[in-house]
Every structure is written in structure tokens, then in C-alpha cells.
Amino acid sequence: MTDETASQEASQSTDAAAPARGFRKVREGLVVSDKMTKTVVVAVEDRVQHPLYGKTIRRTKKVKAHDESGTTGVGDRVLLMETRPLSATKRWRIVQVLEKAK
């Protein structure tokens, strides 16, 4: 019995010692530029409510995203995920292409 409890305690201590990873942000956006190698510029839209008037406002932010395969083009709707810094301004990567441009 003592061997079982010792192994259970050891497994629990290693789980507790490992730092918990944070939740990665996922966004959907539209590719607006693909002129860089392995990098695309994606316009990400965010809808926020005005603090005083309550009207819903669309805010757009352009982010640079890593495109390893280079298959995305201008006008494609893509799914982005936050990642470690890949360059001075690139902190997102493309997870999948949701819709190709027509």
C-alpha cells in the first residue's frame, strides 16, 4: 500500500510543479496583404459597445500573422491563434483558411 500512495503523491507533485499554460486568443479576420514572405497582414474586427451611448461600434485592427505554407491570399477569411513572438511585430499564426477569396 505504501508504494501505491508514494507513486500517487509523486505524480501529483509533478503536476503541481508544472506551470499552468494560459489560454491562447483565437480571432477571425480578413487577409488584406500577402506581399511578405511567410507573413500576411490580417484585419481583425472587434465589436464594442460605446460606454456612454450604448451603440455598437466596429473597431478594426491590422495584425501580422505567420503563414508557413504561403497559401493564403488577399481576401481570404482566416482563423488566427496567438503565439510566441516570431518577430518584432508578429505574434499571431494562421490556424486555418475558413474561406478562400473569389
Swiss-Prot record:
Supply one GO CC term from the record: cytosolic small ribosomal subunit
Nucleotide-binding: present as a keyword of the record? no
Sorted alphabetically, which InterPro entries does this protein's record hold? NA-bd_OB-fold, Ribosomal_uS17, Ribosomal_uS17_bact/chlr, Ribosomal_uS17_CS
Q: Where do the TM regions start and end?
A: none
One GO BP annotation of this record: translation
> Polar residues: which segments have biased composition?
1-15
**What are the alphabetically sorted keywords of the record?**
Ribonucleoprotein, Ribosomal protein, RNA-binding, rRNA-binding
Where do the segments described as Disordered lie?
A: 1-20
Query: Organism's domain of life?
Result: Bacteria
Q: Which PROSITE patterns match?
A: RIBOSOMAL_S17
Q: Which GO terms describe its molecular function?
A: rRNA binding; structural constituent of ribosome
Q: How does it assemble?
A: Part of the 30S ribosomal subunit.
- What does this gene product do? One of the primary rRNA binding proteins, it binds specifically to the 5'-end of 16S ribosomal RNA.
Family, according to the entry, reads as follows: Belongs to the universal ribosomal protein uS17 family.
Question: Under which name does UniProt file this protein?
Answer: Small ribosomal subunit protein uS17
Gene source species: Frankia casuarinae (strain DSM 45818 / CECT 9043 / HFP020203 / CcI3)
